[in-house]
Amino acid sequence: MSKIKVLVVPSDRSGVGKFRSVDPHIFLQNQNPEDFHVDIVYEPPYDDVNFWTQYEIVAYHRSIGPDFEKANRLIQMLNSLGVITVCDIDDYWMPGKEHPIHDIIKVNKINEKIVANLKVSKYVTTTTELFADEIRKFNKNVVVFPNAINPNEPQFKEPTQKSDKLRIGWLGGSSHLHDIQLLNDGFSKLTSHKDKVQYVLCGFDTRGTVTEINAQTGEHTKRNILPPETVWAQYEKIFTQNFSIISEDYKKHLLKYNQDSYENEMNESYLRVWTKPVTSYAKNYSKF
């Protein structure tokens, strides 16, 4: 019996790509080596029909590549050729107004393009039954695959570091400023207990660019973002209550925005943890 050939097109090389696309399909092949052959291709040749028709199943996250409309046409072509198309989605297509790219999504109608891809896909996989019910308004063939990890992966087996403090950790991305702001009152109320608590902010990152627009000429200029301008710097001010819960010396160290070590950081009430690759990021859980 011939193997079922599966093509996986991840949306990125970070968390979503790893945990929603790459790892599950590697597991599928490893558990069923006689039945499945899986190829993972980040940038497939979109216009090569022979490439696509060598597969029985094509799985992708939200879209096959960044061009949603081109992906939609490709999905319909694959359907017509008998290739099973499977669209995975883990986030609602229209984030709230507090989300940093809400306006970009709305202006470019990306939400509508995502829904259009859901409609033409043969099957849709998602994270929860609640979200599945929303998707079923557009496509009845929805299967729930909850987010999952491989607990035997080394990054999830890191032993928890010992501490006399109650450590409160946060791991997340750069789109959660509004969520962190909701915690501000809680952080403020715990200020009097700063000697018994340590906040651990994971994923700190100063990379990125900003686009400045000349009001007179309309000219767009892109430059590297300055560390104090990053959302992570704003997170840090909330966690530390504008640096009031840490020593003045540690504050000076943090405001250098470099990754040099600080000898006494474990005795401070706040710990900055710089971002790590997706294959080792979960080691941060050992810090709280």
Regions found by a protein language model. Give the residues of each.
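N-terminal pre-catalytic "stem/leader" segment of glycosyltransferase-like enzymes
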Residues: 1-66, 212
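Active-site proximal beta-strand in glycosyltransferases
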Residues: 78-95
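Nucleotide-sugar donor phosphate/pyrophosphate-binding loop at the beta->alpha transition
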Residues: 44-46, 84, 95-116, 151
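An aromatic- and histidine-rich active-site surface loop
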Residues: 62-80, 180-182
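Membrane-proximal helix-turn-helix segments that form the acceptor-binding/catalytic region
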Residues: 76-80, 104-123, 137
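Conserved catalytic-core segment of nucleotide-activated headgroup transferases in glycan assembly
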Residues: 12-27, 150-156, 161-284
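Structural alpha-helical scaffold elements that stabilize or flank donor/cofactor-binding regions
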Residues: 51, 116-117, 284
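Donor nucleotide-sugar binding/catalytic pocket of nucleotide-sugar-dependent glycosyltransferases
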Residues: 119-156
